[in-house]
């Protein structure tokens, strides 16, 4: 056996010796793959295929050269093939084993190469999870804008956008966010950044003329970088002024030296930069050392706006654009998760406006209204008209004549012409010299243009009335600062600035938002609003005798027992308490104007606050119930008398209303809301009248005799508060008494510019306004007080054809009413103040969608 083994070993040795002696060599396998070989130096001695950057010229590349060496320089994601790749020059992102250390991994590296689940497949984060990695004491805030992403896209096609849909499901989202008017890109982005209306921050459109600067502003002009255009304090400055750092990857205004400075980091706008590169840069900012890392970051992409303009809002192309936007969000969230920041960063995803379909068949031409279109016109969905010879003719241009010539010219017009001061107050679009005096409010899907030379009428556009559903924008939020799985009612984008300040623990600069109104979005609200403090308390107006002699010029022949009728106004304390419980169920409106002299007047069915400064009520409040009757009885005719509680020198008189004047006395509380003729006398008094243009009384009377009873039936009763507004300088705030007294129209009675009506009911319509324990519903209106009804082309039309449509155009927030009157509503509500602020900032919507 041993001999056999020795023989075998000897044979092997001989064989090897012979092989070596004959020069046999070990076989070399030719190269067949580029894995780990990309960009290697070419060698003629190498066998097999090549992977150098010239191999395509020699037609000598390995079969996987394209996938292994070329695609990584064009791709923003990993693949199984790329995992563990050798480092390649000029790749967009890396999938090499050391990419985490080098901080240049593709955002999906861990999920593709390390087997971790993707952010999209993860469950929604629990509030108890550890949120931030070491070094992040405060959650960064990312503000991400997807231009032109209308809320309806997400409503209709959410299943095609899994990343956005997950953000919606896991975080907080609004049904929609309301843009400011005009619903344009620069306008709304800068409003979001400052919390200011366009009239306040100055960017009133994408194209502007300023007579004081004698300059034109446009998106493409160099003058857009002139800081003189940009007012207010954008959020990036608020952050840096208070010790934080801010970085903006494109945002209107961020590349302008506003107030002498820029954001800590900013990028000059360049639309050619891929969305993925923008996300990658934002993630790199979050990788910076703590001393350099921004606390606030913005990110902007042009889609789906660009595609919406080209193809319209309902198209296969828009779906592709939405999916591109969705992938961009997914890339951001994957990158955040890879850094363990996905539950640390607070992210707000929103849009500036929506998108509407347009057609060249839906154009209103000014050439059809003027023989000579001798003016300058900003054409489109939000047109403005001014003199073409500026600055010379800027102030002398006949704006009123233009509006008159565009009013009620055709049986069907697809726009309404307004002087800026007459625009609906909800738009807040008057108080800036840059807002031209002539404005056209255009119907949905229509545009107003000069003449038939206009050709930009295909696809989609935006700029329309911000109440149009097509102009509504998305709002979604996610992160440790926000409530989870939370849907909230709509709100306006002026509120976002305060919200961002709260997330960053900053003190906001003055703005048009209502701080605290979005506290219900936040897990732990940073700011607690305080109740308003009344500045002027009511005085006493004691019951007194009828003045003798009575020089008021008032008469009421139907009253036979004047003393008995007047005694009805002399309520004892118990009767006053009962009246307040009935007529002021949510508390008395508080007066926030300084040095206002007024007294409370109690009647059984209504209460008013009579002002000795303006000789009329500041407000009148009453509650009406659901009635099966569809009409109210007529008021007693030719019956008006002095209120014996008001001294004659502080009272209106009937002689103030001469027949040759255009004004007539109107009633804040309708006398015929009382159940009997005798009770009507409680309201047929001078303390209940206000001056109204005769044309306006048609609207006012129909509103009260027909529409308010209708709404009371629909809502199981209403509390009604109404009163005058004085805003002669159209700044959206109440005028001083000195200003008011300059507008008395040949009488000592000042003439209001508007009247307000606030209708409050119980959201649960089982309950009446008086026994409502839950949330309230509100309809509020600010009605322009105009001498005629040309706004509705209604001088000869019956009221049922136009009044309701008119008041709906002039819907408003309760907060708008407060600012214009100096009043504070709902002071008696027991609910938390942020809930009351939600009610005050709610804007009813009546606009019907286009069929």
UniProtKB/Swiss-Prot annotation:
Molecular-function GO terms, alphabetical: ADP phosphatase activity; metal ion binding; nucleic acid binding; nucleoside triphosphate diphosphatase activity; toxin activity
List of catalytic residues: 185 (amp-threonine intermediate)
Binding residue positions for a divalent metal cation 1: 305, 309, 462
Tissue: Expressed by venom gland.
Any one Gene Ontology BP term: nucleoside triphosphate catabolic process
Reaction catalysed by this enzyme: ADP + H2O = AMP + phosphate + H(+)
Cofactor note: Binds 2 divalent metal cations per subunit.
InterPro entries named in the record: Alkaline_phosphatase_core_sf, DNA/RNA_non-sp_Endonuclease_sf, Endo_G_ENPP1-like_dom, ENPP1-3/EXOG-like_nuc-like, His-Me_finger_sf, Phosphodiest/P_Trfase, Somatomedin_B-like_dom_sf, Somatomedin_B_dom
Localisation: Secreted
Glycan attachment positions: 39, 216, 259, 270, 405, 512, 594, 674, 745
Cofactors named for this entry: a divalent metal cation
Disulfide bond entries: 34-38, 34-51, 38-69, 49-51, 49-62, 55-61, 62-69, 78-83, 78-95, 83-113, 93-95, 93-106, 99-105, 106-113, 124-170, 132-344, 360-457, 408-793, 541-599, 554-654, 556-639, 762-772
GO CC, one annotated term: extracellular region
EC number in record: 3.6.1.-
Span of the annotated motif Cell attachment site: 58-60
Keywords, ordered alphabetically: Disulfide bond, Glycoprotein, Hemostasis impairing toxin, Hydrolase, Metal-binding, Platelet aggregation inhibiting toxin, Repeat, Secreted, Signal, Toxin
Binding-site list for AMP: 271, 309
Signal peptide feature range: 1-23
Binding site for a divalent metal cation 2: 147, 185, 352-353
Chief localisation class: secreted
Domain SMB residue range list: 30-73, 74-118
Functional summary from the UniProt entry: Hydrolyzes ADP with high activity. Shows weak or no activity on 5'-AMP, 5'-GMP, 3'-AMP, ATP, cAMP, and cGMP. Is devoid of monophosphatase and proteinase activities. Dose-dependently inhibits platelet aggregation induced by ADP and collagen.
Protein family membership: Belongs to the nucleotide pyrophosphatase/phosphodiesterase family.
Subunit structure of this chain's protein: Monomer cleaved in two subunits; disulfide-linked. Is synthesized as a single-chain protein and is subsequently cleaved to form a two-subunit protein held together with disulfide bonds.
Name of the protein in question: Venom phosphodiesterase 1
Species this protein is from: Crotalus adamanteus (Eastern diamondback rattlesnake)
């Amino acid at each position: 056996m041993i001999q056999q083994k020795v023989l075998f070993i000897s044979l092997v040795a001989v064989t090897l010796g012979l092989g070596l002696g004959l020069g046999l060599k070990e076989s070399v396998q030719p190269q067949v793959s580029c894995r780990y070989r990309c960009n290697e130096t070419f060698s003629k001695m190498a066998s097999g295929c090549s992977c150098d950057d010239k191999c395509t010229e020699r037609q000598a590349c390995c079969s996987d050269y394209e996938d292994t060496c070329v695609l990584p320089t064009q791709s923003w994601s990993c693949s199984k093939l790329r995992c563990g790749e050798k480092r390649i020059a000029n790749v967009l992102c890396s999938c090499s084993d050391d990419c985490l250390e080098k901080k240049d991994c593709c955002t999906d590296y861990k999920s593709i190469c390390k087997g971790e689940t993707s952010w999209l497949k993860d469950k929604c984060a629990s509030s108890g999870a550890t949120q931030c990695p070491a070094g992040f004491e405060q959650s960064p805030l990312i503000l991400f804008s997807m231009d032109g992403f209308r809320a309806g896209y997400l409503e209709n096609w959410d299943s095609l956008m899994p990343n956005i849909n997950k953000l919606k499901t896991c975080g907080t989202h609004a049904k929609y966010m309301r843009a400011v008017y005009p619903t344009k890109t620069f306008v709304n982005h800068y409003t979001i950044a400052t919390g200011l209306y366009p009239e306040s921050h100055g960017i009133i459109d994408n194209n502007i003329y300023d007579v004081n600067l004698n300059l034109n502003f446009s998106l493409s002009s160099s003058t857009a970088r002139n800081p003189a255009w940009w007012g207010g304090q954008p959020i990036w400055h608020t952050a840096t002024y208070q010790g934080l750092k801010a970085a903006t990857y494109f945002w209107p205004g961020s590349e302008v030296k506003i107030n002498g400075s820029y954001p800590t980091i900013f990028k000059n706008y360049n639309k050619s930069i891929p969305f993925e590169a923008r996300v990658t840069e934002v993630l790199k900012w979050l990788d910076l050392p703590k001393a350099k890392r921004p606390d606030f970051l913005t990110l902007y992409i042009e889609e789906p706006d660009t595609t919406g303009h080209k193809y319209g809002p309902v198209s296969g192309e828009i779906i592709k654009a939405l999916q591109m936007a969705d992938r961009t969000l997914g890339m951001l969230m994957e990158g955040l998760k890879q850094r363990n920041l996905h539950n640390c960063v607070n992210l707000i995803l929103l849009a500036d406006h929506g998108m509407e379909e347009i057609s060249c068949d839906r154009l209103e031409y000014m050439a059809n209204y003027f023989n000579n279109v001798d003016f300058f016109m900003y054409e489109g969905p939000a047109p403005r008209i001014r003199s073409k010879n500026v600055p010379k003719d800027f102030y002398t241009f006949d704006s009123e004549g233009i509006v008159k010539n565009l009013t009620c010219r055709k049986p069907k017009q697809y726009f309404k012409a307004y002087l800026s001061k007459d625009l609906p107050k909800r738009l807040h679009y008057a108080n800036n010299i840059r807002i031209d005096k002539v404005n056209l409010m255009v119907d949905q899907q229509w545009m107003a243009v000069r003449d038939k030379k206009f050709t930009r009428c295909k696809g989609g556009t935006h700029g329309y009335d911000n109440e149009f559903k097509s102009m509504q924008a998305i709002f979604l939020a996610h992160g440790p600062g926000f409530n989870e799985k939370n849907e909230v009612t709509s709100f306006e984008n002026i509120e976002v600035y305060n919200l961002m300040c709260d997330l960053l623990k900053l003190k906001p600069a003055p703005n048009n938002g209502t701080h605290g109104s979005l506290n219900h979005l936040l897990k732990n609200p940073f700011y607690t609003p305080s109740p308003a403090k009344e500045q002027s308390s009511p005085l006493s107006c004691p019951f007194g005798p009828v003045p003798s002699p009575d020089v008021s010029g008032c008469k009421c022949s139907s009253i036979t027992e004047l003393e008995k009728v007047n005694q009805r106004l002399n309520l004892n304390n118990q009767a006053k308490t009962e009246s307040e419980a009935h007529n002021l169920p949510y508390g008395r409106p508080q007066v926030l104007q300084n040095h206002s002299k007024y007294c409370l007047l109690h009647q059984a069915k209504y209460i008013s606050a009579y002002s000795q400064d303006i000789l009329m009520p500041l407000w009148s409040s009453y509650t009406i119930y659901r009635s099966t009757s569809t009409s109210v009885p007529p008021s007693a005719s030719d019956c008006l008398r002095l209120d014996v509680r008001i001294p004659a020198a502080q009272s209106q008189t009937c002689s103030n209303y001469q027949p040759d004047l255009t004004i007539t006395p109107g009633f804040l509380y309708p006398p015929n809301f009382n159940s009997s003729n005798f009770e009507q006398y409680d309201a047929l008094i001078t303390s209940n009248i206000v001056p109204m243009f005769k044309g306006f009384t048609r609207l006012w009377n129909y509103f009260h005799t027909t529409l308010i009873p209708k709404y009371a039936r629909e809502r199981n009763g209403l509390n009604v508060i109404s009163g005058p507004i004085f805003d002669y300088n159209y700044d959206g705030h109440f005028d001083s008494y000195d200003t008011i007294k300059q507008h008395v129209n040949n009488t000592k009675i000042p003439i209001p510019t508007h009247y307000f009506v606030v209708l409050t009911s119980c959201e649960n319509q089982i309950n009446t306004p008086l026994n409502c324990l839950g949330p309230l519903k509100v309809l509020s209106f600010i009605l322009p007080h105009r001498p005629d009804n040309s706004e509705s082309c209604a001088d000869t039309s019956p009221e049922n054809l136009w009044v309701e449509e008119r008041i709906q155009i002039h819907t408003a927030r309760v907060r708008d009413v407060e600012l214009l009157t100096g009043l504070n509503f709902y002071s008696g509500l027991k609910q938390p103040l942020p809930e009351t602020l939600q009610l005050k900032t709610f804007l009813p919507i009546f606009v019907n969608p286009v069929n």
